[in-house]
Amino acid sequence: MTHILVVDNHGQFTHLEHRLLRDMDGVTVDLTDNTTPPADIDADGLVLSGGPTMADIGHCREYLTLDVPILGVCLGHQLIADELGGRIEAGDYGGYADVTVSISDADDPLVGSLAPDTRVWASHADEVVAVPDGFTITAESDICGVEAMGDTDRDLYGVQWHPEVAHTEEGEAVFENFVAICE
């Protein structure tokens, strides 16, 4: 069994990430608050959930030093970029929207299977505008140049959109691909 830990950054969809992973075969999943000390983290992979603000991310920056694959969703995606030398800014669009995302790296283990494009539910109040060294932009849209990014050497991945919500057409595939990375 692959054990995934969903880190709660107090986003409104965190429970959906937990439920989607819980319902997958071969996966055990737990939900933990972002105040859990890094020494207490024991998992094959982490999902850093979305959330309202970078001011309330607990120990998430420290989790990036753990030797496990990590998937950042929305705020989690932005946090990875910010902590590792990328740049985030306020998005031009803002709010939630149905967005067509173009997959720019069909070989990417997280989003490559969604190529050539997919429809997602995204929030762009803030967004990554420059990826950290070692990362590749793996998806983009008309409203956001970094819809997804990945560093396959460190198994760190992020998506601006919300794969856990029903409005995202192939969201479950993103989580299935992440579990495969963690195995």
Curated annotation (Swiss-Prot):
SUPFAM superfamilies, A to Z: Class I glutamine amidotransferase-like
Residue span(s) of domain Glutamine amidotransferase type-1: 3-183
Pfam families: GATase
Superkingdom of origin: Archaea
Recorded metabolic or biological pathway in which this protein acts: Purine metabolism; GMP biosynthesis; GMP from XMP (L-Gln route): step 1/1
Active site per UniProt: C74 (nucleophile), H162, E164
Catalytic activity: XMP + L-glutamine + ATP + H2O = GMP + L-glutamate + AMP + diphosphate + 2 H(+)
Alphabetic keyword roster: ATP-binding, Glutamine amidotransferase, GMP biosynthesis, Ligase, Nucleotide-binding, Purine biosynthesis
Gene Ontology MF terms: ATP binding; GMP synthase (glutamine-hydrolyzing) activity
Matching PROSITE patterns: GATASE_TYPE_1
EC number: 6.3.5.2
InterPro entries the record matches: Class_I_gatase-like (IPR029062), GATASE (IPR017926), GMP_synth_GATase (IPR004739), GMP_synthase_A (IPR023686)
Enzyme class, spelled out: ligase
Subunit structure: Heterodimer composed of a glutamine amidotransferase subunit (A) and a GMP-binding subunit (B).
Protein function: Catalyzes the synthesis of GMP from XMP.
Name of this protein: GMP synthase [glutamine-hydrolyzing] subunit A
Species in which this protein is naturally found: Halobacterium salinarum (strain ATCC 700922 / JCM 11081 / NRC-1) (Halobacterium halobium)
Gene that encodes the chain: guaAA
